[in-house]
């Protein structure tokens, strides 16, 4: 498998950056995971979007799906791209209806060479963590979540964990919609994952502090950045 980070900001992109978007490749299968602002340009620099096997949207917040709207124009006359997304919010899902082969993420099991395992997580709108497996390798993406029952077990022994790490210790609270870097690292350690990449950085947050706090728990933690490529 290969993961390419296209964007890693939220809820809006920093100068020169992009919101959540990741390209996962396994053999001939290519899946775009989330499609926030700036993601489409980064994707198009690497491949034609019509070469995608599917798009998987962890949830329907703008910073994870806004570039689906210009993608509608890019895909005109090129067939309906399969898009897996939660069923709600209905008004957000409705923006995609008709333009794509829209499918329920809740029931997704296979995309090409990839087998999917979906877990509902804790966020203000329905959001799903997804584990992708192919040829004995596994990749886990938390989507957006705070602490969540079952998340550590879901990520157990994966080869690469891409985890929401929006907050420093000082910023995090139990009632907020995202994990801290330290909590993401603790989950990675307890799950026995082989590699951890932190993502979903708010512009202006000290990413060095995020990495420092994560590495106190999981010393090999990495920060996502546009253009980062990892093979596993």
Can you say where each PLM-predicted feature lies in the sequence?
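Active-site metal-binding loops of divalent metal-dependent hydrolases
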Residues: 8-9, 35-38, 60, 121-123, ...
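Metallo-beta-lactamase
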Residues: 80-127, 134-136
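Cap/insert and terminal regions of metallo-dependent hydrolase folds
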Residues: 148-229
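Active-site metal-binding motif and surrounding structural segment of the metallo-beta-lactamase
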Residues: 38-82, 159
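Short, surface-exposed connector motifs at secondary-structure boundaries
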Residues: 27, 52, 75-79, 135-137, ...
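Divalent metal-coordination and catalytic microenvironments
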Residues: 3, 22, 34, 43, ...
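Short, solvent-exposed loop/turn segments at secondary-structure boundaries
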Residues: 16, 97-98, 172-177
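Conserved beta-strand hairpin/beta-sheet module of binuclear metal-dependent hydrolase folds
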Residues: 1-47, 128-143, 160
């Amino acid at each position: 498998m290969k993961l390419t980070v296209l964007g890693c900001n939220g809820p809006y992109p920093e100068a020169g950056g992009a919101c959540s978007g990741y390209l996962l490749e396994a053999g001939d299968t290519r899946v775009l995971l989330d499609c926030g602002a700036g993601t489409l340009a980064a994707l198009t620099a690497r491949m034609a979007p019509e070469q995608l096997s599917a798009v998987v949207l962890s949830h329907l917040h703008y910073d994870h799906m806004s570039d689906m709207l210009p993608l509608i124009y890019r895909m005109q006359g090129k067939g309906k791209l399969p898009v897996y997304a939660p069923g709600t919010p209905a008004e957000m899902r409705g923006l995609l209806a008709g333009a794509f082969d829209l499918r329920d993420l809740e029931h997704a099991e296979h995309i090409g060479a990839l087998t999917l395992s979906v877990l509902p997580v804790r966020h203000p709108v329905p959001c799903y963590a997804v584990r992708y497996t192919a040829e004995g390798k596994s990749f886990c993406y938390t989507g957006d979540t705070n602490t969540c029952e079952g998340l550590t077990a879901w990520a157990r022994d994966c080869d690469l964990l891409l985890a929401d790490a929006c907050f420093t210790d000082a910023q995090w609270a139990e009632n907020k919609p995202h994990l801290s870097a330290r909590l993401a690292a603790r989950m990675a350690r307890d799950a026995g994952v082989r590699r951890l990449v932190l993502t979903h950085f708010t512009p202006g947050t000290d990413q060095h502090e995020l990495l420092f706090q994560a590495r106190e728990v999981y010393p090999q933690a990495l920060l996502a950045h546009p253009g980062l490529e990892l093979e596993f």
